[in-house]
Amino acid sequence: QLFINWEEQVMARWPNAKFNDGTIWDNDNYWAKGTIDDDENAYSNGTIIDDPYTNSAGTLISLSSEGFDLDETNKQAIAILNLGSFRTWSRLVTNHSGNTFNYATVPSWKTKHHYYYFEGRKEFLDQEGEWWVDTYNNKDSLYYVAASGVDPNKLDFRGKVQSYAFSVNASEYLQIKNLEFFATTVYFSNGDNCLVYGCNFIYPSCSKRMLRIVDTEPEMTKFAS
């Protein structure tokens, strides 16, 4: 995660969406769609055929019109796939041609309401507030699109650097009280009578897709046995 003035910025993606106007949650207008609702036999698990449409803002969302190279060797796009009603997975694009792409199959695949978007390639970096990390050539290079007229050297950048501020194993009667956790959280394992009380957790967990880690559950707040 990347933050400016404590606000989360958007990982470079297609179709574009933002946090500050709520469009990032609007899958009917700011995600791409598969044709499965028109024909449940149009394709099978592991394939999506894009269904072009014009969203509520008047923007055409059409994969074939973008000219992307989604399956470039070692630089494949990451597809975020909502293919199981309330379940979403991330997968590398394994093959792409025109309006069709392939990915490693997912569990609980359903023949209705397929939504998706892409991350993981620099060509998606085209909107103010988006960012991308170059994991191909120089892992120290971070790209950010600042607002028009804004000098990025004067912005207050902060980045998530760890999953857990406290990772506690086999402990008893340990208490964490009245702390604020920003872009980090806590993990307890095999403990007894441990307590987290009066704490604020702001952006505690996130995927590691920017580091090209896919098909992995985010490291979340946990009390594990």
Put a short name on every predicted segment.
Residues 1-224:
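Extracellular polysaccharide-degrading/modifying enzymes targeting complex plant/algal/animal polysaccharides
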